[in-house]
Amino acid sequence: MKYTSSFLALLLSVLLGFSGSYGQGPFFKEIENLKEYFNASNPDVAKGGPLFSEILKNWKEESDKKIIQSQIVSFYFKLFENLKDNQVIQRSMDIIKQDMFQKFLNGSSEKLEDFKKLIQIPVDDLQIQRKAINELIKVMNDLSPKSNLRKRKRSQNLFRGRRASM
């Protein structure tokens, strides 16, 4: 009986150890499928260095990383859209897209639809260019006031803290 419980405890710890590596998501198997399909483990893939890893190292703060990650996710969504008619890898792409959707957009279908709209906007269309330039002031204003307001609040809090400690 003692051996049985010891064996079961060992088996459970082995299973938990494996579930730690496989429990990270169903997308690992699907990524391996895509790697095999595209022959992405071939040594010639390393020529010229990585596409995204080195860039991500330069972005340390979480809010800054989100900016660059949105561009990377956009790239993958475009890549998957370009390959949507390939039935051999369709299932793998669907599972990976779903996992990206959950991780990056917190499962919000509204955010996903907005994200898809943005990545599908053609930049070589004159009418689109004109609309984008027309909205540029609003976009720039949306980018700046929040950060200025945060800086102002931070400096006010610092000033109050110094005055209180004097």
From Swiss-Prot:
Keywords for the protein's UniProt record, in alphabetical order: Antiviral defense, Cytokine, Glycoprotein, Growth regulation, Pyrrolidone carboxylic acid, Secreted, Signal
Domain of life, source organism: Eukaryota
GO CC annotation terms, alphabetical: extracellular space
Record's keyword annotation contains RNA-binding: no
GO BP, sorted A to Z: adaptive immune response; defense response to virus; humoral immune response; positive regulation of autophagy
Residues where Pyrrolidone carboxylic acid is found: Q24
Any Pfam family: IFN-gamma
Annotated GO MF terms: cytokine activity; type II interferon receptor binding
Carbohydrate attachment residues: N39, N106
Tissue: Released primarily from activated T lymphocytes.
Locations listed in the record: Secreted
Residues spanning the signal sequence: 1-23
Subunit structure as annotated in this protein's UniProt entry: Homodimer. Interacts with IFNGR1 (via extracellular domain); this interaction promotes IFNGR1 dimerization.
Family listed: Belongs to the type II (or gamma) interferon family.
Role noted for this protein: Type II interferon produced by immune cells such as T-cells and NK cells that plays crucial roles in antimicrobial, antiviral, and antitumor responses by activating effector immune cells and enhancing antigen presentation. Primarily signals through the JAK-STAT pathway after interaction with its receptor IFNGR1 to affect gene regulation. Upon IFNG binding, IFNGR1 intracellular domain opens out to allow association of downstream signaling components JAK2, JAK1 and STAT1, leading to STAT1 activation, nuclear translocation and transcription of IFNG-regulated genes.
Cross-referenced PANTHER family: INTERFERON GAMMA
Name used for this protein in its record: Interferon gamma
